[in-house]
Amino acid sequence: MKKIIFSILVLFGIFVSSFAQLPSVVLKDINGKSVDTALLQNDGKPFIISFFATWCKPCNRELKAISEVYADWQEETGVKVIAISIDQAQNIQKVKPLVDGNGWEYEVLLDPNSDFKRAMGVNLIPHVFIVDGDGKIAMSRSGYTEGGEEHLIEKVRELIAAKGESK
């Protein structure tokens, strides 16, 4: 019974999220530039938003796994990854060294007060959203298991195919 209820809640979350737009929260990137989250986009192509923290081992495993295939994903689909750090102010100085040390080519935004995290309804990290080319949330997922990044690119491919375009 618990599995059925959980499945219904997950499906409801996916259904509801497929119509939502990104909320407007002003964050800073790792270089201090202000960014309004409602204006995040990828030239009409899908993009991935990944909530993480420097101390979250599954988050870092997921972002490392994505980074290993990111160049291929970009070449094939034009997808962009935007990583949102929810590290609090006292740990924010650890984000840039983590990003640089791993060679992550992602756009990285800082959410030290968890304003965007709350606005997006994120309770657990890692949490990933896929946003379609029209700015609508097409998928939402919490947690990471090895190989889970393949599900992300498959969803991106589906969105591109549904729109009838490629990179």
Features from the language model and the residues they span:
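Structural microenvironment flanking redox-active thiols in thiol-disulfide oxidoreductases
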Residues: 61-101, 113-117
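Boundary of Sec targeting at the N-terminus
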Residues: 19-21, 33
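A short beta-strand-turn-helix
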Residues: 26-46
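Short, internal strand/loop/helix patches
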Residues: 98-134
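Thiol-/selenol-based redox modules, centered on thioredoxin-like
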Residues: 130-167
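Bacterial N-terminal signal peptides
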Residues: 7-17
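Positively charged n-region of N-terminal signal peptides that target proteins for export
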Residues: 1-4
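Short pre-active-site segment immediately N-terminal to redox-active cysteine/selenocysteine motifs
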Residues: 44-47, 52-55, 124
